[in-house]
Regions:
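Pyridoxal 5′-phosphate
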Residues: 1-139
């Protein structure tokens, strides 16, 4: 089987419309600032939050913007773990370091019981019956 590259998170070229929106937003400055451009930035940020919430059919308070994928992974993994009654996490050794280190941190400091999925030499992750037991999250 030919390999399929799926790690476009940091390397996928931006679409023209996204680049234009980013360029426009990048001139707005600090959304926490009390000056005119800060207030415009805050309004743009909140409008984006509302638009995304509408698309996802959720409340705007549920939309969280982060500065990086690492921060997003950390918030998601810790949040799901802490919100769950289960202390079990399912992961693999080939996770992105941001996810892997967060899982290891929860195991070391918060009592998480990690079920490590086996990984073949070709990078295939084996699931087997691992998912038959409830878990706080699967990364």
């Amino acid at each position: 089987m030919a390999p399929v590259y799926l790690d476009h998170a940091a390397t996928t070229p931006m679409r023209d419309c996204a680049r234009e929106a980013w360029l426009e937003a990048s001139t707005l400055l600090n959304p926490g600032g009390q000056y005119a451009t800060g207030r415009r930035a805050r309004a743009a940020l909140e409008q984006a939050r509302e638009d995304i919430a509408s698309l996802l059919d959720c409340e705007s308070i549920e939309v969280i913007f982060t500065a990086s994928g690492t921060e997003a992974d950390n918030i998601a993994i810790q949040g799901l773990y802490r919100a769950s009654d289960s202390r079990r996490i399912v992961s693999s050794s080939i996770e992105h370091p941001a996810a892997l280190e967060t899982v290891r941190g929860l195991a070391a400091g918060a009592g998480a019981e990690v079920s490590w999925l086996p990984v073949s030499p070709s990078g295939m992750v084996g699931v087997g019956d691992t998912l038959d037991t409830p878990a706080a999250l699967v990364s």
